[in-house]
Amino acid sequence: MGQEKLYIEKELSWLAFNERVLQEAADKSNPLIERMRFLGIYSNNLDEFYKVRFAELKRRIIISEEQGSNSHSRHLLGKIQSRVLKADQGFDGLYNELLLEMARNQIFLINERQLSVNQQSWLRHYFKHYLRQHITPILINRETDLVQFLKDDYTYLAVEIIRGDTINYALLEIPSDKVPRFVNLPPETPRRRKPMILLDNILRYCLDDIFKGFFDYDALNAYSMKMTRDAEYDLVHEMESSLMELMSSSLKQRLTAEPVRFVYQRDMPAALVDVLREKLTISRYDSIVPGGRYHNFKDFINFPNVGKANLVNKPLPRLRHLWFDKEKFRNGFDAIRERDVLLYYPYHTFEHVLELLRQASFDPSVLAIKINIYRVAKDSRIIDSMIHAAHNGKKVTVVVELQARFDEEANIHWAKRLTEAGVHVIFSAPGLKIHAKLFLISRKEGDDVVRYAHIGTGNFNEKTARLYTDYSLLTADARITNEVRRVFNFIENPYRPVTFDYLMVSPQNSRRLLYEMIDREIANAQQGLPSGITLKLNNLVDKGLVDRLYAASGSGVQVNLLVRGMCSLIPQLEGISDNIRAISIVDRYLEHDRVYIFENGGDKQVWLSSADWMTRNIDYRIEVATPILDPRLKQRVLDIIDILFSDTVKARFIDKELSNRYVPRGNRRKVQAQLAIYDYIKSLEQPD
């Protein structure tokens, strides 16, 4: 079998994942407004795909053609464009279908031609008092440099200003970062009707208000467009430049980076399309996509709650871990010292972690706090706690990852604010991102210093903890806390040798340990001992690890995979991966936690990790995986994994065809894993 038959291209696998998101928008069992929001998630994902994956592919094509090689990447580009076009056609059809369904529920998203006289008057007042201040036309002439002016992934209206036989052009930015994209209009008869209008259409209606008095014209026509830029940046090293200065400079590069996709309204006149392509220096490698009247559907993620309660998901109130609420504990440290605590978001509340850090910030017994941040919430209480801790005389060290994609600017801001407050801020070495999810609290207890550690699979982010599934392990077990301390020492001194007996730490020992554990399963299978591998990942694309899993399958090891996103491995290939089953689940929460389970001859090993099985995570980032040493907590993770693999509602097969076929229910009972996990955790969190 040829090499190309053993692996799915990661870009195509990623698009298949986004098509699963689109399936959720099409799923009539989902509430109507949630289906609209899935359209927004699909659109947001696709924007990121073009910024990152497509831009990387474009660079590969340019390099290979400069070297005179026959580029496989060019063939892949064609496959991508074909797949995106087909999915986008499905998107357009779904959007129209959902508009009709909303109308049946008395929710009307109307355009500027459907306004009543009363609504027209109301809109002009709204424009004058709330919107006009944010509108400044960009006139397109010979001197205009649109590459410098246009913002990445913003929607613009390209306006024809027609006077006789002369046509001039201007651009209007849709200011959806300053004004809501969805605007509720005053109701008409009957009163139960709920009309809304998009910001785009308000500008279309008010074109005269924008241009009158400044231009002579016979007609104004507006067409929507959007440009996506390459999200990569170059870190040009200079002896006198700090990493923060380099990142700030590189972010400015991103703002004017190469366009990689140009989407425009399908009926935009060809002459205007040509002007925009020329001004944006759109090359033949870029994706030029004619589309509908509206772009930036990512704003539909925040589609407002309107209409009846059954149009959105029934809420699942986040659960408290009742161990923290026992009267015998004076604080969170007492609870964790007595036994390890495992939290699983968003089923559990993130409040426990926030409260522990708040307590640490003023507890007289706390000596020091170390934490690493990758993506934090906009109004982060964790940052506030670190600042308060510094003000209270604690020794506070915050490791800020300045190279967290799309969060670089926010992290530069946090780094400056923390430094000003007296916090010791350190950064990763360039090229070695810190993706681990750790904190370490050192506390004086009697004559001893006791350490409390957090090892997680997700970010310290209050917002994503409500949307992403992730684990937090809180422990005072010295076997783990001593090694978390070593990780922080390694971060501060990345070129000093360091060893770990319990933790799996990239780039130190992850690949070696994973290979050893897979090889042990192979040996056990060959000896007739219990064997098996179960993995829950966001992405599985490292060829070395994929090949090791193929070898395990060939030796009779049963491999079960739950991969949300990219998966290069092809299950069920005869003679290669007969013993590998792979599924993916897309539902109301984003499956984000990483879990590795090895049968280990009957004594299961369960690991929680920040690392996906991608080359960058294994070899070029600082990642941490921890074994679950407490048998109770180990069983809890195993139970949750069993529920996920029993899903008969939201699980799809991962296969060679990228078909996204749903796992058939057959005669099994209906199990929607995320709802079943909520019930499972709720059953555990009952008062004594």
UniProtKB/Swiss-Prot annotation:
What is the name of this protein? Polyphosphate kinase
Name any one GO molecular function.
Answer: polyphosphate kinase activity
User: What does the UniProt record tell us about how this protein is modified after translation?
Assistant: An intermediate of this reaction is the autophosphorylated ppk in which a phosphate is covalently linked to a histidine residue through a N-P bond.
**Keyword Transport annotated:** no
GO BP: any one term: polyphosphate biosynthetic process
This protein's record includes keyword Nucleotide-binding = yes
Q: Which GO terms describe its cellular component?
A: polyphosphate kinase complex
Domain PLD phosphodiesterase: where?
430-464
Q: What class of enzyme is it?
A: transferase
What the entry lists under InterPro entries is as follows:
PLipase_D/transphosphatidylase, PP_kinase, PP_kinase_C_1, PP_kinase_middle, PP_kinase_middle_dom_sf, PPK_C_dom2, PPK_N_dom, PPK_N_dom_sf
Keywords on this record? Answer: ATP-binding, Kinase, Magnesium, Metal-binding, Nucleotide-binding, Phosphoprotein, Transferase
Give the residues the record marks as binding Mg(2+). 375, 405
* Its biological purpose: Catalyzes the reversible transfer of the terminal phosphate of ATP to form a long-chain polyphosphate (polyP).
Write down a Pfam family by its short name.
Answer: PP_kinase
Please give the catalytic activity noted in the UniProt record: [phosphate](n) + ATP = [phosphate](n+1) + ADP
What gene does the UniProt entry assign to this protein? ppk
The family line of this record is:
Belongs to the polyphosphate kinase 1 (PPK1) family.
